[in-house]
Amino acid sequence: MKRLKNELNALVNRGVDRHLRLAVTGLSRSGKTAFITAMVNQLLNIHAGARLPLLSAVREECLLGVKRIPQRDFGIPRFTYDEGLAQLYGDPPAWPTPTRGVSEIRLALRFKSNDSLLRHFKDTSTLYLEIVDYPGEWLLDLPMLAQDYLSWSRQMTGLLNGQRGEWSVKWRMMCEGLDPLAPADENRLADIAAAWTDYLHHCKQQGLHFIQPGRFVLPGDMAGAPALQFSPWPDVDAWGESKLAQADKHTNAGMLRERFNYYCEKVVKGFYKNHFLRFDRQIVLVDCLQPLNSGPQAFNDMRLALTQLMQSFHYGQRTLFRRLFSPVIDKLLFAATKADHVTIDQHANMVSLLQQLIQDAWQNAAFEGISMDCLGLASVQATTSGIIDVNGEKIPALRGNRLSDGAPLTVYPGEVPARLPGQAFWDKQGFQFEAFRPQVMDVDKPLPHIRLDAALEFLIGDKLR
């Protein structure tokens, strides 16, 4: 009888144990590394003070334990959890160093199943959770697959106005006199590509998000490769699209076109085939506050980046993405990060603003049966909320330490617009976002957070039942 029970348990193990591959990405400076570090920290401390009341498996005491286990793919770098934790609990505390490529961490979550018929044979089940971190810049490259070199060039040069125009002056000057039909000058093309790369780095440093090609700012082991030595053609109309399209591969225009095509075929498709195709669920982190602080160009750039990014998640039956990759992602969560950097009364506005930014994608995802949600969170709570008296008026405020110098601050950042801001908002400029460093924390206690448990419930809650 005991042998029969053991054999039944082994059979049930194969049927009940589950694997879930969760992808975490976000626009630049959205806090991906802090999010993953905090999520893992909460799960590993479910019996040591973690605050996860919105995760039903914890609330109902069904989650029995969580431990780290070795990852299955030895070719992917390990996510730097311990290093990030040490920085957060450091003296002084600091935000984890951002990751610059794909990394992974794997957890085993042991739980009691409440609704499975198999519970009659087996008391517990295991969810193997693989958390994969990858740069949002790589996701922003996917729409390039629907473009040819000349249409992409038109789009890129069409953005070169305002500050982008100022930052790209060097690139434009280096392109002057470049004959598209002349024999390819590899050294000159490499120098022009380097100038384009410098421009992209400057855009990123200034808080802009729509960066293409994404690998140019995060090259990894591809640094210096010809695949990363191209740039848009500076003026398609001056030469005529038909003439440029006929340039053979040994000309300047032809070589740039060939490298663009190689980048799309090998680099962009390669990432999605090797990684994205295997994702089950996805969370996209968005910092809406810094663009509001920076002004209309930065905010509109974030909006453009999200629009481009959402093309990557366009699940329509006839889309390029569906034809190429047949994705299996069934849940998609958008999170407005740094909820601790605004007062509690503005949290609903943060979520409403993010919903406005991704409205079209939300409608499409619902049509395709994809479960999608938006929420606001703080992976690691860096401030405390309070009330201050200003000229006899009680107003909500935040207390924390400024990121730049650690100075203590008590501030009211202002109101977050609930809808896409119009000119009146920018004229008023009533929003002043401060960047805070992490607060000093007890190393024996889990990291403080805001609604991280709500994100966990959406992303993995149904797999723990």
Where are these regions (language model features)?
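Glycine-rich phosphate-binding P-loop
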Residues: 22-40
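Short, conserved secondary-structure transition motifs
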Residues: 335-342, 375-386
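Extended oligomerization regions of viral-like shell subunits
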Residues: 362, 366, 370-378
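Short secondary-structure boundary/capping segments
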Residues: 39-44, 144-149, 299, 348-354, ...
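GTPase G-domain guanine-specificity segment
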Residues: 341-366
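Conserved beta-strand segments of the P-loop GTPase G domain that flank and frequently precede/overlap
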Residues: 23-25, 284-287, 333-338
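Long, charge-rich C-terminal accessory regions
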Residues: 369-372, 384-404
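Switch- and interface-adjacent substructures of P-loop NTPase systems
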Residues: 7-11, 16, 42-328, 343, ...
